[in-house]
Amino acid sequence: MPTSIRWSCGNLCIVDVTADEPPRFRFRLDGSNLVLSTGFDMTGKFLEEMPDAEYRRFVAAIYQRVLARKAPVFVVNQEDWKGYDLQVESVTMPLSSDGVRVDGILDAVFTAVQR
């Protein structure tokens, strides 16, 4: 792995998009930093298994937008998470094995505590 991106690997999610209608989202990888910050590991699970319903709806809306646009979606959001005021910045990018259908998503999520 290139050392220039190694620092960010714990902040990445790799998500498979099923061919079902409607599509389902299965986390192939949920980055270790994200697991530590959320308290749950989505690796190997479908989005509908995410325990936090409000966050699940938020993520689903972003993933649906990526599918519809076939383009990256950038989000900057303020969140109160476990008593901390966080600024969350993410870029969610479509992946395609055939160049036509979005069958994967790469999600990079970074947080900073706001004081």
Question: Where are the regions that the model predicts?
Answer:
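Sensory/regulatory domains in signal-transduction proteins
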Residues: 1-115
